[in-house]
Amino acid sequence: MYDVVIIGAGVSGSACARELSKYNLSICVVEKEEDVCCGTSKANSAIVHSGIDCKTGTLMAQMNIRGNEMMDELSKQLDFEFRRNGSLILCFSEDDMPRLKELYNQGIANGVPGLEILDSKKAHEMEPNLSDEVVAAIYCPTGGIVCPFGMNIAFAENAAANGVEFLFNTEVKEIQKEQAGYILITQNGEIHARCVVNAAGVYADVFHNMVSENKIHITPRRGEYELLDRAAGGIVDKTIFQLPGKYGKGVLVTPTVHGNILIGPTADDHDDKDGTNTTRAGLAHVTTSGTRSVPSLPMRQVITSFAGNRAHEDGHEFIIEELKDAPFFVDCAGIESPGLSSAPAIGERVAAIVERLFKPSKNADFIETRKGILNPKKLSEDEYKELIKEKPEYGNIICRCEMITEGEIMDAVNRPLGAKSLDGVKRRTRAGMGRCQAGFCSPITMEIIARERGISQLDITKSGGKSKIVVGMSKNRG
């Protein structure tokens, strides 16, 4: 029996695992997919929100502000990409100025530092490519951008280094109460836990409702995005929002930490928790809305589109608490935007709840830091030459779009919680994330995965499950 079982290895579940590993507890993370960061955490805006948009007094506002504050130190400790680039919220009409000022006042009430209302001239001085329609903007200097994959993986790897066990390809089918805690019934057998942390994203309501009479409901809210080539990078430096509406913050235009431009999301409620397809209408809306903010966006440089589901709870609020009618069952539910920004604070809050329940001793051997995959592009020319002398695989470029080496892919496969699929390698190294979208490097990456894991290429998938790539070999190859 584990002390704590966490359902879900997204950014919230992984942040909880990392925080809980600071205590002497037996912890297991159960994930139905083949890797961490396979749900909402892999398909979002990659934004660290300032906290201006959250309703004052809500848990959502509290978690957003605290998570934002934690990001600088965490990104250094855990070695993931984060940049505090600031954000602008645009107003296109004098008629909307009262709403802009209301949003500004809400941000002040939430404790967001450094907010400033800019007139059109100052906004365009800050971002010259903004639409001429812009009459004013709110500047939020604490807004930032982050690599969501890198952040999620960093939390999980650090948790694993501190003794947390991860069970992948393990789907929870049912949860039963027992005297000592809970039984999680999976396709791989039963898992017993004294305490359960429900961080299951769009499925969090399903697990909550298995153990509680106080039902909740989560609607999948699909958001579609378009990603522009790195050649388009530099058209904006700040994250560009429009005034938020009923369904969220609207379509944004933002740089990514790797130099692309990201546009999106839409906000379409539907009933398929696994429905992450894009639509012609959705992508057309992304283009129309994005070019309203930044008319010169080079939309011919879109290299891919994608969609993700946000876990929209009917009350539009984070639910992070022990259930009154299910002791030792802790919800981490309704985690939609700003969930990525809030994840570090969510981990803190869940750990505080569990600490109150167990009163465990501190883990004296807790490892606070984690080193990510070596990026040769950040080395000096002399340092890179020395690296290649020592490890020649770092001189073999596999992904030409993103200049990713064999050494980086080998590290991604062999490190704790290493990549097993093409998408797993992509999330860790960016191999396959460039202009050709893995058209060139996939076969070579598969050879490396097969070699390093000692498996056949026939067993390698794009993203786990039934996403097989090769069904037979035409030559005597691995």
Regions found by a protein language model. Name each.
Residues 138-195:
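Helical element adjacent to the flavin cofactor pocket in flavoenzyme catalytic cores
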Residues 15, 175-264, 268-279, 288, ...:
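Flavin-dependent oxidoreductases
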Residues 248, 257-258, 274-397, 404-417, ...:
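C-terminal catalytic lobe of FAD-dependent flavoproteins
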Residues 22-42:
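Glycine-rich FAD pyrophosphate-binding loop
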Residues 2-29:
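N-terminal Rossmann-like FAD-binding beta1-loop-alpha1 element of flavoenzymes
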Residues 55, 62-65, 92-99, 138-157, ...:
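Short beta-strand to alpha-helix junction loop
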Residues 405-416, 439-457:
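Iron-sulfur (Fe-S) cluster-binding segments and ferredoxin-like electron-carrier domains
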Residues 46-126, 250-251:
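Dinucleotide-binding Rossmann-like beta1-alpha1 core, especially the glycine-rich loop
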